[in-house]
Regions:
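Bacterial N-terminal signal peptides
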Residues: 8-16
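Rhodanese-like catalytic fold shared by cysteine-dependent sulfurtransferases
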Residues: 20-59, 70, 88-117, 126-212, ...
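Short hydrophobic beta-strand that contains or immediately precedes a catalytic carboxylate
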Residues: 64, 77-82, 95-98, 218, ...
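Short, surface-exposed ligand- or partner-binding patches at beta-edge/loop junctions that are enriched
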Residues: 121-122, 272
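Residue-level signal for short, function-critical loop segments
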Residues: 82, 124, 233, 275, ...
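Bacterial N-terminal signal peptides that target proteins for export
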Residues: 1-8
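Short, compositionally biased "basic patch" segments
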Residues: 28-37, 72-87, 226-238
Length: 340
């Protein structure tokens, strides 16, 4: 009887093992879940590292002319990001062309030299400032030319857009500070932790976003109390006068986590600085981090003519004329999205 029980037990065991072996593999081994990472933390560290390095925020058209054109200094590498049409009509001699909408693409940026100072040229300096921030995060030494082609020439045909404004709007400023709030940080779920790949993905996602807001449009939003204002100037200049309702976070500390919690992730943010260049870089960094931001075109220098409030010179259209080259056809056809 005992042997019979053992025999029956062995038969049952073999039957069970045989049944298990016939189960589909998917029932035996569960699929591994896709691991997602918070890209925000990775990109924030890169943005903070960049701002803490005290980057050069712009280079004057005069320096570009003196060094790159007159002295033919080979360390300067000029990239024009305006439209194909405007580049073809007039551009600074020696500059190559990459359209603004293509500035995030590997096949446009991988060949750029890492041992030269890349000067980025657009219409007014704002789009080039955004691209400069992006390319700097990729490891390039990139600097926008101040005021773009509008700082090179007063001729609208040469610029391809509006020339420099000749005077400030003289809109009101206040000294009272607005109490801030605390917000959750954005989350950017992604499968990769590679910073360069994350930058490319975010660059593509925000390529078509507006770059600037005009002072008149911003004034209307301020009057309607329908805007979140971020002033990134130095504390002393902010205290001397700022746009009503603005929150002050100086540029260098903008990407610190404690400061980013002061910004709403679900509300448009207008970034204000001295002349629009630093604000444009800040706006690009914030957009990469998942915020929705634009820069005030020409910054406080067009909002008010009071240099004590601005912390810098007011806008001026008094610039010398400089040479340009012409082409019969675009050197590098690109998409229609234009720089500003």
């Amino acid at each position: 009887m005992r042997y019979m029980r053992n025999f029956l037990f062995l038969v049952l065991l073999v039957s069970l093992l045989s049944a298990c072996s016939k189960q589909p593999a998917s029932q035996i081994t569960a699929e591994k879940p896709t691991v997602m990472f918070n890209a925000f933390a990775i990109l924030r560290q890169d943005a903070d590292r960049y701002l803490q390095s005290n980057p050069v925020l712009s280079i004057s058209a005069q320096e570009v002319y003196d060094k790159a054109i007159v002295a033919a200094d080979s360390k300067y590498y000029l990239v024009d990001i305006r439209s194909d049409e405007h580049y073809a009509k007039h551009h600074i001699p020696g500059s190559i062309h990459i359209s603004y909408a293509d500035a995030w693409r590997n096949n446009k940026t991988d060949f750029l030299p890492k041992d030269k100072k890349i000067i980025i040229i657009d219409y007014s300096g704002h789009s080039s400032s955004q691209v400069a921030a992006f390319w700097s995060l990729l490891g390039l030494e990139a600097v926008p030319m101040k005021h773009g082609m509008a700082g090179w020439s007063k001729d609208k045909e040469v610029v391809g857009g509006s020339p420099m404004p000749c005077e400030a709007r003289n809109f009101p400023v206040v000294k009272e500070e607005t109490a801030g709030k605390t917000y959750d940080l954005p989350r950017l779920e992604n499968k990769t932790t590679r910073a360069a790949e994350l930058l490319r993905q975010r660059g593509e996602a925000i390529a078509a976003k507006p770059v600037v807001i005009q002072a008149d449009e911003l004034m209307a939003k301020v009057n309607a109390k329908n805007v979140f204002l971020l002033d990134i100037r130095a504390v002393e200049h902010f205290k001397a006068g700022h746009i009503s309702g603005a929150l002050n976070i100086p540029l260098r500390g903008l990407a610190e986590e404690s400061n980013l919690t002061k910004l709403p992730p679900d509300q448009p943010i207008v970034v204000v600085d001295y002349d629009g260049h630093a604000a444009s870089q800040a706006a690009r960094l914030l957009n990469l981090l998942g915020y929705d931001s634009v820069a005030l075109r020409d910054g406080m220098s067009v909002w008010t003519g009071d240099m004590n409030v601005i912390g810098a010179n007011a806008v001026s259209c008094a610039i010398p004329e400089r040479s340009t080259a012409q082409l019969n056809a675009p050197a590098n056809p690109g998409p229609s999205t234009a720089a500003t």
